[in-house]
């Protein structure tokens, strides 16, 4: 039974005007520590996700696409940070999920792709970087490549950076994402982007990090700005405490594997929990979790600006003051800067609306391993240990898990084993190669000073330069056909770390080290299952009243406020429950009558034979192999030849020019490489149809003039018709995309025809495609 006082509070709050609700939320101070058992959650809804598009005029983006007057509404942490870095907003405008904004990010990082970005920058007619303090360049991906071509590219990048006064970090200094964090570029409460898919990592320090593509980076260099549509926002609440022997890597591997139905695909994630819960997750673990939200399908993974982060920053400020007193207030981390940050830290408003809410009880987690060859397959370590999987290679590398704390965990495995080996550090198992590379030189120095680095060398580990290396399939130590590898990195797609005939697993640093020591996938034995824990407790919102009873008073009030805000918003929009429920039926007829404006010269319809790649989650490595990504002299003919090579080696001989490529769901997930789109164009395939697309791929497609449309019904119908799963199939079906009428017409091999309404391709997107992509569009604007 609900307590009468609580019921009265709920009723009063639900009937109160917005001003009262806001005041009540500000005065609520109860911070209940959630119980170890996971509580339920609920779903609230946001407006329909709009199609990504670059507005016709960057400068007029906000004023041309957003209403001039909007109601004041509670904001999520993501929305608050975006608010600070959006320009050109209407007076009083509060940004919300679904809005298009012009972003002026705090920083923009590029890595080995800096030279291709520079070439785009120069080709559009730009001669000066808009704000050189905004741009950071790092060399980290192909640092083992000593060929003259690669060294020349590296020289060109350094010379370009020096010419424009840009902060530059040479090869061997560290992985770009780690540098952005340790050098303070990824500052809490800011928006910081990079032309790399793992920009999400910055969320570990309360910085909204999200990936951009090369063309976006060139736009930022030239104008200081680019476009972004605020994604749906998911709230992930942690309960319980992270047990000994369980790490941030286990948390994110479990999330990827347990919520593996695209639950957070193309969402911005906000992680939260009771103060005690969040204290159990140190910053290094937060960085790991945020880093791999990319593999979970999200566009960002944001942790709160809290006491844990403040302590981490204070420690860095103290060390800097002691080691470099000459820097004074010019140091990246100072106590004065931290004081200013913490004076009024950004937090989500009570009653902020989330598209989705998920819960995970940390107390019920055990060590997990992802794979083989997929982050969506998460298996408890104890189950894999029982299989005695013989190991060939182990990797303690990448920006995900090769910081000093990770190296210390790996070293501890060998130190513990030395106790049973007369105090001598044992060697890795015969036949196993163990590769190590620190996330940065600073992290390596810290590991060297502690002696942990030397422990791993004594154990027989082979050191590599600080850089991406094996994680992206470059340099020494790649997996050979038939081999099994385990890595502390973030991505184990087939062929990512070497041969497509190898098997790659992902795990925490201590599991990687223990596996190298024992010659099979194994753990160090640090984890002891708590009494009463039988399974991982997770939850999704379903609106069950019994679950609501378990909420804290503050959470309950938040929910009431959210519901009240929804009612108010609908009332202000003139909507009633009856009108919203009938909107779908009434809108269908109006959609039939609406016609999209077609720009002169743009085709009104696109037709072709369907070639079907029957798989979900075809990633960018499958579309365009990583080993070609940084070979900037590859011809279009070669790109066409290797298109889809890692997915299906026979694709090149089956596909024909003019085909329409149809794939499963979440096509183009993975890295931010633009070649995933341009290789398809090189194959002379003008249109990709999918059940759904990865967001970065969608952005790359528009920016590079590749058209795409989502038609889930077509994927389902093809799977019904062709029951036997074939990687690539010529169907004999024909598809016509009627751009003007926003529909597709499908003619099956039997002669049966049917049609389906699809999203509109607005004139501003047509303009980009007609120009040949964003780069040429920006050039046309400069020349105009």
Swiss-Prot record:
Stretch list, region Disordered: 572-596
Enzyme Commission number(s): 4.2.1.36
Protein name: Homoaconitase, mitochondrial
One Gene Ontology term of the molecular function aspect: 4 iron, 4 sulfur cluster binding
GO terms for biological process, alphabetical: lysine biosynthetic process via aminoadipic acid
Taxonomic superkingdom: Eukaryota
Localization of this protein: Mitochondrion
Cofactor: binding comment: Binds 1 [4Fe-4S] cluster per subunit.
Taxonomic source organism: Neurospora crassa (strain ATCC 24698 / 74-OR23-1A / CBS 708.71 / DSM 1257 / FGSC 987)
Residues involved in [4Fe-4S] cluster binding: 399, 468, 471
Family: Belongs to the aconitase/IPM isomerase family.
GO cellular component, one term: mitochondrial matrix
PROSITE patterns noted in UniProt: ACONITASE_1 (PS00450), ACONITASE_2 (PS01244)
Transmembrane portions of the chain: none
Function according to Swiss-Prot or TrEMBL: Catalyzes the reversible hydration of cis-homoaconitate to (2R,3S)-homoisocitrate, a step in the alpha-aminoadipate pathway for lysine biosynthesis.
Gene responsible for this protein: lys-4
Pathway(s) annotated for this protein in UniProt: Amino-acid biosynthesis; L-lysine biosynthesis via AAA pathway; L-alpha-aminoadipate from 2-oxoglutarate: step 3/5
